[in-house]
Amino acid sequence: MKVVLLQDVKGLGKKDSIVEVNDGYARNYLIPRKLAAPLTEGLEKHIKEKKEAEQKKKEKELMLAKDLADKLEKSQVIIKAKAGENGKLFGSITNKEIADEIKRQLGIDMDKKKIELEDPIKQIGSYEVSIRLYQGIVAKLKVHVTSS
C-alpha cells in the first residue's frame, strides 16, 4: 500500500514522502497514529504542487542571497570606537556591533549569527568579515575600524 507520510518516521522517510509499506503496517500502525495517510490522486497532486512551490521559494531565496552578497561585497562599513594611543580598542567589536552598523549604514537587516568572526576585533584597522547568507553563499564585507 502506498502512503504519504504526515510526519518524519524513523526508518521509513521524511514528512510528505510517498512510501510503499505493507497493508497491515499502514492500517494498524501508521494511519491510526496519524503518521501517514493513504495515497490518493488528489493528495499526490497536492504534494507535487507543494514541492514545486518549495523549490521556487528556495530558488528565490538563493537569488536574493546572491544579490545581497554582491551588494555586501561592494560595500564597506566604518565603525568608530574609542581607542588608546597604540591603536588598541577599549573593549572590542563583536558581530553584534557589526550587524548594527550594517543596518545603520547600509539599511540591511543582518542576523548577528550569520557574521563570522574568529575573535572580536580589538585593534584599529581594516578587516574582511565573512557573512554566511545562504547555504554555499558567503559574502566578504570590508570593515574599517577607526578611533573616535
Curated annotation (Swiss-Prot):
The keyword Nucleus does not apply. Keywords: Ribonucleoprotein, Ribosomal protein, RNA-binding, rRNA-binding. It comes from the Bacteria. GO terms for biological process: translation. Pfam families: Ribosomal_L9_C, Ribosomal_L9_N. GO terms for cellular component: ribonucleoprotein complex; ribosome. SUPFAM superfamilies: L9 N-domain-like, Ribosomal protein L9 C-domain. The keyword Isomerase does not apply. GO terms for molecular function: rRNA binding; structural constituent of ribosome. Gene3D superfamilies: Ribosomal protein L9, C-terminal domain, Ribosomal protein L9, N-terminal domain. Binds to the 23S rRNA. Belongs to the bacterial ribosomal protein bL9 family. This is Large ribosomal subunit protein bL9. The gene is rplI.
